[in-house]
């Protein structure tokens, strides 16, 4: 009888789920303490005033206010939270 030799298994078939990285609160948006502003791998965005950075480089608000993105001359983008009183005065 004719038999077919066993075929090798495919080496494909792996795909990981997306990690939902990126900006979660855009410039001008109101945030409260603890709100996540951005999830990232490495420091695409750097923490500025009233913004903290977690161990996984997540940026979060330390005070209530409005988010502001500002690019510096060295090419780095800093994310700050302007407190409500300061944001209203500007």
UniProtKB/Swiss-Prot annotation:
One of its GO terms (cellular component) is cytosolic large ribosomal subunit. One of its GO terms (biological process) is translation. Disulfide bonds: none annotated. The keyword Membrane does not apply. Keywords: Ribonucleoprotein, Ribosomal protein. InterPro entries: Ribosomal_bL27, Ribosomal_bL27_CS. It comes from the Bacteria. One of its GO terms (molecular function) is structural constituent of ribosome. Belongs to the bacterial ribosomal protein bL27 family. HAMAP family: Ribosomal_bL27 (MF_00539). This is Large ribosomal subunit protein bL27. It comes from Rhodopseudomonas palustris (strain BisB18).
């Amino acid at each position: 009888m004719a038999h077919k030799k066993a075929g090798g298994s495919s080496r494909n078939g792996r795909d990981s789920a997306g990690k939902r990285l990126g900006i979660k609160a855009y410039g001008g948006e109101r945030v409260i303490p603890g709100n996540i502003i951005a999830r990232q791998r490495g420091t695409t965005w750097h923490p500025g005033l009233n913004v903290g950075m977690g161990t996984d480089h997540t940026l979060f608000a330390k005070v209530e206010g409005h988010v502001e993105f500002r690019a510096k001359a060295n090419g780095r983008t800093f994310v700050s939270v302007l407190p409500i009183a300061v944001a209203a005065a500007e």
